[in-house]
Amino acid sequence: MASFLSFLLGEKKKTASVAKERLQIILAHERNGRNASEPDYLPALQRELVAVISKYVKISPEDLKVQLERQDNLEVLEVKIELPDTVR
């Protein structure tokens, strides 16, 4: 009888398990929606590198490229900086 009532009324899930399931779904959607080859931190890293390098050499944001490449089971962070001919 109890199983019949739970079938009709539905078993109440614990709040924590419901929240966990929802979070897993949200994370899965976010991972699928973004470019897997470019982590979220790359644009911020590029801006910070430009700011630091600009203290010593005059460069623009276009002079610096940051890219993350996956090779087999390794991740390689590649930073290319086009330096001017003369230093300040």
From Swiss-Prot:
GO-annotated biological processes: cell division; regulation of division septum assembly
Q: Which InterPro entries match?
A: MinE, MinE_sf
What are the alphabetically sorted keywords of the record?
A: Cell cycle, Cell division
Q: Name one Pfam family in it.
A: MinE
Functional summary from the UniProt entry: Prevents the cell division inhibition by proteins MinC and MinD at internal division sites while permitting inhibition at polar sites. This ensures cell division at the proper site by restricting the formation of a division septum at the midpoint of the long axis of the cell.
The similarity comment for this entry is: Belongs to the MinE family.
Query: What protein am I looking at?
Result: Cell division topological specificity factor
